[in-house]
């Protein structure tokens, strides 16, 4: 009769005969003994425990072999794709890379192929990590369908359907509550949870579905704050709240009561250090790595519904939907990373760099050096950034202060950015469509509906099509178009930033403009579904995303979608819904194309520009804070140059490129002129005279989001009284300087009057400085439709109270304004009402 001892000996002999090494034999033996012990402790006889353990070990080895084969196949596919893309860099005309710093460099061209795997570059065929991530996000959020409009974010980022949130948790955990909406959301979430597993496995990863799965994202800051010394309170709470029937070792074994305290000690350290203190891979009898991976995926700790709510209330940030949406964002990143770089992204990234070096070396030492520079300064920091390899310390007071102040300054300073964004995005969309041979833009009606007249319906259509409008699921996103930084920092400051973006129409415009491009794309494909691939004027653009004639034929054979009468789309997501054989691949290509092109037409701050400005420096260090300040508001202009500089390189001839750049430059100069004049009017001033070089220079710079530098064409200081050195240092440094002057200015003046040799009398000007400080840094004070009224009715009144000389100073400033810029005020400073309407005077 089989027993544990005889099976172990038999198994070891068999493994030796099949060529297994000692280390692997020991791993399998340990696994058998662990499973046998589990069954024995569950009440099974020794013989039955050995039999069941034998079955588990063999099943595990079979699954392991299958997963190994699957991962190998995925890696080979990724490797082949990477080699093909790098070879494209070898063969591409070097003239396409004149925008990348090394004129005529083959090494740069080869290394740029690697960078294009992380972020879209139209000079290379295929998808990138960022686009793949958007594809995954869209497919997952689409599963919520109409319910997303009931429990997403509403006006000013407020959570909709708050009363239903606790019941959503209970429904996910299998408890019937009688709440119809909660049931619908829970069912949709469970589909999302299963789909993330399926998508990860299809990409080459290894995950198992979990019944009634509900993620939990505990905040390191709140754990430290409320968890007691060394986590004593947190550990007691977890011992009481965790569902120990479901919280098991990764192999399914029960975690014994005597093992739980040590386990929670290690989990506490891992979660409160944001993963910096990893669980030892040898811990828990070799289960450490698996436990760490499950913690990272929020799949290790399990609670019933009521205890999950207790845990969330005490140790988590945000609400239930924030947790669900956050999990989607995390899994979208991981799935996209595996799709792009295979099951072992770090190893693949190193292989990519090795291939780049090998190919560049064939073209000489200079090409190799140029390639190394791109890998070091672009690829490596971009890869580290998307994988959070140098994440900010979650406990850092300095980091929270820097990011929080960045959000406050965004709220105070970007309230009129929509003056440039709205006309600019229409101009850029027209330029991109011309580049792609897509014809004139016909989506103005859709834009108006998405912005004002039919918002909810357009949001629902977008979500169902796999194009998630970020403001529906995130309380803050629009400011990242300009800074790339507005989605971090203390929650209150994020809300301030987002409130300004929404009230100034920046959020609504960005949402509407991007959806207009996306919907027009799907409508265009529907209208052209009767044409052969070679007859499509925009076929070359499709080929950049790896789309072939066969792909087009498969997509145009789909049943069109008609969300409302007279509106028909050819949607990539229907390739999945209608069970086409290669539906997932079709969806990735066509959806990726639409995502990437919409972000070219309506641009935002890019990953590469952020890395170029900040590297991987963190704002919780002194040098990182200084660099953070320097980079604010410079990310978008640099991104603008990168996006459209490289897009123009798609023209085949030098004259074609120059013509496209000239047309875009002229168009954006007109946009800058319009935005500049609208901004002047919003501040109570007449439009600027336009018959001078200074205005044209300011308009040109404004068209590229550099309007603050345009002021120096008229005067040595800008509208805030800052010189070029202050602008270069960034708003955080300027804020620190102004704060220091406000707090300590009178101290130094008093010391000088008392301790100096002069007889001058000390006069405090702190009140006047405080009003100017508030005028410049009050959140929301720059919102275009409220700015003039706030200036005249609030800040001018306060200035009169704080400074007896305020009226005289205003008259002096008005004369200087007229002398430097040539325009006057239609709403005179200090007056309670406008004296006339704005006038243009030459």
List the predicted regions and their residue ranges.
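Low-complexity, small/polar and acidic-rich linker and loop segments
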Residues: 2-195, 209, 215-224
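Short, mixed-charge aromatic SLiMs
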Residues: 141, 443-458, 698-702, 758-775
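Long, charge-dense tracts
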Residues: 189-190, 219-327, 331, 335-336
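Eukaryote-specific, cytoplasm-facing alpha-helical/coiled-coil scaffolding segments in long proteins
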Residues: 216-227, 448-455, 657, 802-806, ...
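Hydrophobic, often aromatic-rich secondary-structure segments at membrane interfaces
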Residues: 300, 304-419, 424-696
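Short low-complexity linker/loop segments enriched in small residues
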Residues: 644-758
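Hydrophobic alpha-helical segments
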Residues: 748-842
């Amino acid at each position: 009769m089989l027993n544990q001892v005889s099976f172990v000996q038999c198994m070891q002999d068999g493994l030796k005969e099949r060529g297994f090494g000692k280390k692997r034999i020991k791993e399998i033996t340990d696994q058998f003994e662990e499973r046998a012990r589990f069954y024995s402790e569950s009440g099974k006889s020794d013989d039955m425990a050995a039999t069941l353990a034998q079955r588990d070990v063999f099943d595990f080895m079979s699954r392991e072999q299958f997963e190994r084969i699957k991962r190998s196949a995925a890696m080979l596919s990724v490797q082949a794709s990477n080699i093909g893309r790098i070879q494209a860099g070898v063969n591409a005309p070097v003239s396409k890379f004149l925008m990348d710093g090394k004129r005529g460099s083959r090494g740069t061209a080869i290394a740029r192929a690697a960078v294009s795997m992380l972020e879209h570059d139209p000079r290379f065929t295929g998808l990138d990590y960022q686009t793949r991530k958007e594809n995954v996000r869209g497919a997952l959020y689409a599963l919520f369908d109409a319910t997303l409009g009931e429990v997403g974010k509403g006006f000013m980022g407020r959570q909709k359907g708050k009363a239903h949130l606790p019941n959503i948790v209970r429904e996910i955990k299998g408890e019937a509550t009688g709440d119809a909406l909660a049931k619908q959301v829970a069912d949709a979430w469970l589909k999302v949870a299963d789909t993330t597993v399926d998508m990860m496995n299809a990409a080459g990863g290894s995950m198992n579905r979990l019944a009634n799965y509900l993620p939990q994202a505990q905040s390191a800051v709140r754990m430290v704050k409320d968890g007691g010394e060394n986590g004593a309170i947190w550990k007691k709470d977890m011992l009481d709240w965790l569902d120990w029937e479901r919280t098991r070792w990764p192999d399914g074994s029960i975690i014994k009561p005597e093992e739980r305290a040590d386990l929670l000690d290690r989990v506490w350290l891992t979660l409160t250090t944001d993963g910096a203190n990893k669980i030892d891979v040898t811990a828990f009898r070799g289960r450490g790595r698996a436990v760490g991976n499950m913690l990272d995926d929020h799949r290790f700790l399990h609670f019933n519904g009521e205890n999950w709510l207790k845990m969330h209330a005490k140790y988590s940030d945000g609400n239930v939907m924030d947790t669900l949406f956050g999990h989607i964002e995390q899994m979208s990143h991981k799935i996209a990373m595996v799709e792009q770089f295979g099951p072992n992204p770090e190893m693949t990234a190193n292989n990519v760099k090795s291939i780049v070096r090998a190919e560049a070396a064939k073209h000489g030492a200079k090409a190799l050096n140029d390639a190394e520079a791109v890998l070091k300064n672009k690829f490596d920091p971009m890869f580290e950034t998307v994988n959070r390899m140098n994440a900010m310390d979650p406990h850092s007071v300095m980091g929270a202060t820097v990011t929080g102040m960045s959000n406050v300054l965004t709220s105070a300073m970007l309230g009129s950015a929509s003056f440039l964004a709205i006309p600019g995005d229409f101009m850029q969309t027209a330029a991109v469509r011309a580049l792609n041979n897509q014809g004139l833009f016909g989506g103005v009606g859709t834009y108006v509906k998405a912005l004002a007249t039919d918002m909810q319906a357009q949001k629902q259509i977008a979500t169902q099509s796999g194009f998630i409008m970020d403001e529906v699921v995130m309380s803050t996103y629009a400011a990242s178009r300009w800074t790339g930084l507005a989605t971090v920092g203390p929650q209150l400051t994020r809300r301030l930033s987002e409130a300004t973006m929404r009230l100034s129409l920046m959020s609504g415009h960005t949402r509407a403009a991007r959806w207009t491009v996306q919907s027009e794309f799907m409508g265009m494909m529907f209208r052209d579904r009767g044409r052969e691939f070679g007859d499509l004027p925009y076929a070359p653009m499709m080929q950049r995303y790896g789309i072939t004639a066969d792909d087009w034929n498969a997509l145009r054979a789909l049943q069109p979608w008609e969300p409302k009468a007279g509106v028909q789309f050819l949607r990539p997501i229907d390739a999945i819904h209608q069970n086409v054989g290669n539906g997932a691949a079709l969806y990735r290509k066509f959806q990726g194309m639409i995502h990437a092109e919409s972000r070219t037409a309506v641009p935002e701050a890019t990953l590469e520009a952020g890395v170029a400005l900040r590297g991987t420096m963190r704002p919780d260090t002194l040098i990182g804070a200084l660099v953070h300040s320097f980079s604010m508001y410079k990310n978008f202009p640099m991104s603008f140059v990168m996006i459209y500089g490289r897009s123009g390189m798609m023209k085949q001839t030098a004259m074609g490129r120059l013509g496209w750049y000239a047309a875009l430059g002229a168009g954006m100069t007109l946009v800058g002129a319009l935005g500049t004049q609208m901004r002047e009017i919003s501040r109570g001033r007449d439009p600027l005279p336009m018959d001078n070089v200074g205005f044209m220079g300011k308009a040109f710079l404004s068209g590229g989001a550099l309007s603050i530098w345009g002021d120096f064409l008229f005067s040595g200081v800008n509208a805030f009284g800052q010189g070029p050195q202050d602008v270069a240092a960034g708003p955080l440094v300027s804020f620190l300087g102004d704060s220091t002057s406000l707090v300590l200015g009178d101290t130094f003046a008093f010391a000088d009057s008392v301790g100096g040799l002069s007889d001058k009398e000390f006069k405090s000007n702190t009140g006047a400085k405080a009003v100017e400080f508030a005028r410049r840094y009050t959140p929301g004070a720059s919102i275009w439709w409220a700015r003039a009224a706030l200036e005249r009715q609030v800040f001018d009144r306060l200035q009169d109270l704080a400074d007896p000389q305020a009226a005289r100073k205003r008259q002096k400033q008005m004369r200087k304004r007229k002398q430097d810029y040539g325009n006057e005020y239609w709403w005179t400073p200090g007056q309670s009402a406008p004296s006339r309407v704005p006038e243009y005077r030459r």
